[in-house]
Curated annotation (Swiss-Prot):
It comes from Saccharomyces cerevisiae (strain ATCC 204508 / S288c). Keywords: Glycoprotein, Membrane, Repeat, Transmembrane, Transmembrane helix. BNR repeats lie at residues 57-68, 101-112, 229-240, 394-405. It comes from the Eukaryota. SMART domains: VPS10. It is found in: Membrane. SUPFAM superfamilies: Oligoxyloglucan reducing end-specific cellobiohydrolase, Sialidases. This is Uncharacterized membrane glycoprotein YNR066C. It is a single-pass membrane protein.
């Protein structure tokens, strides 16, 4: 009898929540606006923040009630919740100003910070802020400045660092100008890109790519010099990487376990083949082995999967002048060390165009690939039939081992589709513009 009572009690505890779940109706509130607005949410809370007609509004009850922020002055350009501290921190940037505002308590209070840009810096927009994953006081500010170069407007950025969250100092490039009229640019990021980073280094360790470019009277590139350097003291001193002394560094990206650098040997030819270099310790780099020559790698599309492999989308933008057939656009995945890459057999369609990939951190082992066809008519002699290229989107849930189409789940409206959605091998969701 006692056992029966226990079983009944357990069943009641399990059954009542199920009934409540079936009866659950989400509460929806409506907020009217005469203007377009941006809306962000703080992680793990009911707090929302929105920018509406140059006013920042805060809600602590999931949008039911809103209160305007009065501390912020100036023409607001952008509102961003800190992606590394999404529970409580947000930034508001001011248009054409080195000033921005920050909150560390979900919008309850705000403080203003100003970047001490040089007198010659005429901001074309606002300064962007990079944050540290563990120490909120560490910030990097990148400020794009317009300069007049013999009647031509050029952009030359200034980079600043703070280790106390208040006062910024300029990061002087370790790559010095060879000519006074060369245009200098800098790109700096923290070596630790996430709270669980495997790359060694202190909180003040940053990696910077410095570039100098010169142009002739016809505005053609006449000189190009780059340097990748590591600083362990917040940009006060640097150590360059000798592996890249005779190369042009195109881009770099810092992941959880790897740092990826793309280089070119020909400093005057943007179409020259690229090399990919990998570092696991921010001290030395090794050249990765690729299955073929690579010409088009965009660092923003590179990811690291849940088992530490690097995923690189390779896009083909131009056909080969000697062969009118399109060169392949591929997805390459490395071994665990990131040094050997192999192509992924994810689709059988001819590839000529762009590939985007996403590897959402909240879906372990998941990769989404999307192919966008593109055509280079300058080299097309009629041998390549553009009709065979089409958009294609596939998903893998086992770190790229197998791929499948995205099934359309909409039984109520199945008749409104031009194909049979119960057969995803022939009728699937093609979404070339996704964001995860």
């Amino acid at each position: 009898m006692i056992l029966l009572q226990v079983i009944c009690t357990i069943w009641t505890c399990l059954f009542i929540p199920l009934l409540n779940a079936e009866e659950f109706v989400p509460k929806v509130t409506e907020t009217l606006s005469e203007y377009s607005f941006s809306l962000e949410s703080f992680d793990d809370s009911n707090s929302l923040i929105r920018l509406d007609n140059q006013v920042v509004w805060i809600s602590s009850d999931s949008g039911e009630n809103w209160e305007a922020v009065k501390e912020i002055e100036g023409h607001i350009l952008e509102l961003i919740v800190d992606p590394l501290h999404g529970q409580d921190r947000a930034f508001v940037s001011i248009h054409l100003s080195p000033k921005f505002y920050v909150t560390d308590d979900r919008g309850k209070s705000w403080r203003a910070l100003t970047i001490p840009v040089s007198e010659n810096c005429r901001l074309g927009t606002s300064c962007s802020i990079a944050t540290h994953p563990t120490d909120k006081k560490y910030l990097i500010a990148d400020c794009p400045c317009f300069i007049n170069d013999n009647g031509y407007i050029q952009i030359q950025n200034e980079t600043y660092f703070t280790n106390d969250g208040e006062s910024f100092y300029n990061i002087e490039p370790s790559l010095k100008k060879k000519e006074d009229d060369h245009i200098t640019s800098s790109s700096c990021n923290f070596v630790k890109s996430s709270k669980d980073s495997d790359i060694e280094g202190n909180d003040a360790s940053i990696l910077c790519l410095f570039s100098n470019h010169g142009y002739d009277s016809d505005r053609h590139l006449s000189a190009a010099y780059t340097q990748l350097a590591l600083s362990t003291d917040g940009g006060k001193t640097f150590k360059k990487f000798d592996e890249f002394n005779d190369k042009i560094i195109y881009q770099y990206k810092i992941l959880k376990s790897h740092i990826i650098v793309s280089t070119q040997d020909d400093r005057y030819n943007e179409m020259s083949p690229m090399d990919i270099w990998i570092s696991n310790d921010a001290s030395t780099f090794q050249k990765a082995r690729l299955p073929a020559q690579v010409r088009h790698v965009h660092m923003y599309g590179i990811y690291e999967d849940s088992i530490g492999r690097i995923i690189i989308p390779i896009s083909t933008i131009f056909t080969d002048e000697k062969n009118d057939q399109p060169a392949p656009s591929e997805i390459l995945i490395s071994d665990s060390q990131g040094l050997k890459f192999l192509p992924v057999e994810w689709t059988i369609n001819p590839h000529f165009g762009y590939i985007d990939i996403a590897s959402p951190h909240f879906l372990e082992g998941t990769i989404i690939g999307s192919f966008h066809p593109s055509f280079d008519y300058s080299h097309n002699k009629g041998k390549y039939n553009k009709k065979i290229a089409r958009y294609e989107t596939k998903i893998s849930v086992d770190n790229g081992l197998t791929w499948s189409n995205l099934k359309v789940v909409d039984e109520e409206n199945a008749d409104s589709f031009p194909c049979d959605i119960t057969r995803p091998e022939r009728c699937s969701l093609q979404n070339p513009f996704y964001s995860i």
